[in-house]
A protein has these predicted regions:
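Sec/Tat signal peptide C-region and signal peptidase I cleavage site
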Residues: 19-23
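N-terminal intrinsically disordered, low-complexity segments enriched in P/E/S/T
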Residues: 24-170
């Protein structure tokens, strides 16, 4: 066995292990499965980094609750999660922009100077239950839509990424 074979197998195993877990069957009950990847570019102080977050790690961040309805749901719902700004502060990221990706490669770009930026919530539960993939989970970026008209625009709706699995900080 050559070293190239060992490197290829090691990379394949690491890719499998480091890939966020999106199995509908496990319904994200495993709090230690990776559900979100966050990449941060290199700075003068550090190299580029990729952070893997488990559901337990997200729940360890300050929790925020929004009671709101959405254009995709019929009733008032209670969304619990971590604000995007709190997640980025936890990894000392200072974004010029943020791109949020869904498992189907839908993406939305966030501008930190935009009004309402601080209210983007990475929701991990709705009405006290985890969200399976078939119900826009396991992670869904939501806003307090009915708190203010500024959250009821096509632009904000387009940033409401469900099935969130990756964030690229630029």
């Amino acid at each position: 066995m050559g070293w190239r074979f060992v490197v290829k197998i090691s990379f394949l195993i690491l890719s499998f292990v480091m890939t966020p877990a999106y199995s509908e069957e496990n319904n994200f009950g495993n709090q230690n499965a990776l559900v979100l990847e966050v990449s941060v570019p290199a700075t003068e102080e550090r190299t580029a980094l990729v952070f893997g977050f488990t559901m337990a790690m997200l729940k360890a961040l300050p929790e925020t609750v929004y009671k709101t309805s959405t254009v995709w749901t019929e009733e008032l719902n209670e969304f619990k999660g971590a604000r995007l700004v709190d997640l980025l502060a936890a990894i000392d990221a200072r974004p010029k922009s943020v791109i949020a990706w869904a498992i189907n490669d839908y993406m939305a770009e966030f501008d930190p100077t935009q009004e309402g930026w601080n209210e983007a919530l990475i929701a991990y539960s709705v009405n006290g239950k985890p969200m399976p993939v078939r119900e826009k989970g396991p992670l869904w970026i939501v806003f307090p839509y009915y708190e203010s008209p500024k959250f009821r625009s096509d632009y904000i709706y387009s940033q409401s990424v469900w099935q969130l699995n990756r964030i690229d900080v630029e």
